[in-house]
Amino acid sequence: MAARVSDWYFMNGTSVEKAAEQIQEIRALAAAHGRDPHEIRFGLNGFVICRDAEEEAHATLREIIANADHEAVEGFASQVKHAGQATAEKQGMWAESTFEDLVQYNDGFKTRLIGTPEHIATRIAAYEAVGVDLVLCGFLHYTDDLTDFGRRVIPLVRDLPSQRPAPTEAGEALSA
């Protein structure tokens, strides 16, 4: 349906490689439906843990997981995996999600926006390079962490050269 009628396609958190696969699949389906595949924009869920050192960020991640409400996460896992049985492939989008992935309910940890400002900016640029237009970020301490993200990460992202392939007249990305 997204390929036929949607302006935006939002993905759960995932690796750069899997995001690229989803984007390519949706664009191919859009073209098969007679749409310009570049009319569809792509959003990605991500959970940000920005710290001065990688180990500090990963310690925060371990703390979040250790303090998770296990009953709630297991209940969510059971429900979404059961719901996945109703999909065409009989799995659903959370089939490969671990307990740790589901602590941040839309697989936000899978984006790996966890580390130093430089690491996070580089990850965001990698997602942009495969066609992600927007990263929907979650934060542990929303006000403080969002402010920190805006001050320390966004300027780095803006300073990085865009890696997004330019569309051609036919709407296809230029290949190297």
Put a short name on every predicted segment.
Residues 7-11, 40-47, 135-138:
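Hydrophobic faces of well-ordered beta-strands that scaffold small-molecule active sites
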Residues 14-129, 158-176:
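An alpha-helical appendage that flanks or caps ligand/catalytic pockets
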